[in-house]
Amino acid sequence: MRLISKVLVKTNCLEVGMRRAPQWYSHYSTTAGNARVNKKGSKVVPVLTGLALASIFAKKWYDDSQIKKADATSVAVDASISAFPKKMGPPQWPFSTQYELIGKGVRCVSSITFKAYGLGIYVAAEDKHLVSEVLDSKFLSQAFIDTAAPPSPENSHQDNLRAALNDPAKAPILINNLLDSGIRLMSKNTPIKAGSFKLLMDGTKKSVLKNPDSQSQDKDRLEAGFQELHDCFRSVKGLVARDDDFFIELNKDCSMNLSYYARKKDEFVILGTVKEPLIGKLLFAHYLAAVDPPSPEARKEVIDALVSLS
């Protein structure tokens, strides 16, 4: 089992790997050589071991006693992983802003019976107003939402919005307009089964390509974006433990900040940024508008949240 060799920290204006601690969390910092820093500021000596030794650590690797149960500030997603915080942001978490959970569920791979990840979708608290500004706009209401002629007195705008967000033809249009508004979102992917960083990278790429709109995009831009995604994972290799977290922050310009939290070691790793906006937009549109989304449960809860915010 090979573990992460270093923690790379940056602020919004820094490139990954520069040795400067972010102002919003002063005890996150890089250190000389291959040492790492945990959330408590303690120096951690890197440990290297072979994949063949993974079974020796199986008991600790799957220690259920470390799983955090739901409380007033969190919600349960699956019994095998820690509850998801309702709010995440500085100073406890080194993200760009404060986020609030709007949807959660289990993400299945290959078979509906194989639970791979817990998926949480968060919205920036400062950007919640954009939901009503976009989805209540006169143009979208008349063209895609409140389209019944004559208008039905039995259905409110919220009823019509819910129906439109569940419509395979209308949902992508509405969600893409919302993403174009500059709304900031974040996904939290928590493995239910131990995996690898390669699986995280490949799964992210596959989710982008599953969006039908990816077929009509500029192939050179897509490939450049996928190369940026690949570059983000150059600094990490090996296994990803159950109950660790992989975060994807969608910025206003649809670029993405990628990061990873090793729960048992209490370490936060800045993986890098995918600057190509096509990748971020296609990925989050797939999360929120796909006919076959990664987590139907999470998408349903997101729709409920968007309707309540409109």
Curated annotation (Swiss-Prot):
The annotated phenotype of a deletion mutant is: Increases frequency of mitochondrial genome loss.
Q: Name one GO molecular function term.
A: heme binding
- Principal subcellular localisation of the protein: mitochondrion
The similarity comment for this entry is: Belongs to the AIM18/AIM46 family.
Sorted UniProt keywords = Mitochondrion, Transit peptide
Could you confirm whether the keyword Aminoacyl-tRNA synthetase appears in this record?
no
> What cellular-component terms does GO give this entry?
mitochondrial inner membrane; mitochondrion
Gene3D superfamilies from the xrefs? 3.50.70.10
> What range is the organelle transit peptide?
1-20
- Please give the superkingdom of this protein's source: Eukaryota
Identify this protein by name. Altered inheritance of mitochondria protein 46, mitochondrial
InterPro entries, per database record: Chalcone_isomerase, Chalcone_isomerase_3-sand, Chalcone_isomerase_sf
Tell whether 4Fe-4S is among the UniProt keywords. no
